[in-house]
Amino acid sequence: MRTPALAFALMLATPLSGGAYTVITDEHVDLQIEYVGGSLRGKIRADNEGNVARDTGLLYDGPVGTTSIARPASSTWNFLGVSAGQPIYYWSANNVPGHIFLGFGSDGGTIPGGTFASYYESDARVDETAPWNKITLTAMRYTAAPGESGAANFSLWQVDTFGDVVKWMATADGITSTDATWLVESGHAHYNWGFTKRGHYELDFKFSGYLAGSNTYI
């Protein structure tokens, strides 16, 4: 199921106005997947605010709380969408005090164990059998902050136990079906979230999986 409009405001002077947003900053947050009425849908779950509707939650990182680094020179990082040495703004896969700690989750009873069937996922980034819930990026919209111009890019990645970069999603080469990650049923995982420019981002995700028993793909 398509889950629209997960919103991010990155390094704006003030949070965006003109909408009924619940502004979330400086805490642990998950985009939570839940199984309701035969379909998958998403919501925001924040440690302080609790459950927040996905289209009213704004994850905000202002000038004080924003992490940025210079893009490394290695071609490994080309997927970020900026040249070597240029800044990339990101939220870490590790819990860094003062910054948003964002992940995906289907734990806490939102997807009871046994809801989804195990299957072998052949994507080389996974290559395992489990009751997978697939998370696919389907669209991104960007509104520039004052002083910014041009296109912006988003990326999602992890670093594995061998120190290798695992790219899950990147808009710099276009959005395709390969812009996806997988979460084990009732699981929880954190990622590095990268943004190339200051401004307001909206990301659309589709959640899918095979139901246990019928193997129906939803």
Regions found by a protein language model. Name each.
Residues 9-11:
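Cleavable N-terminal signal peptides of Sec/SRP-targeted secreted and luminal proteins
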Residues 13-15:
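N-terminal signal peptide c-region/cleavage motif recognized by signal peptidases
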Residues 189, 197-201:
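Short tyrosine-centred short linear motifs in exposed loops/low-complexity segments
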Residues 210-214:
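Short, solvent-exposed loop/turn segments at the edges of extracellular beta-sandwich modules
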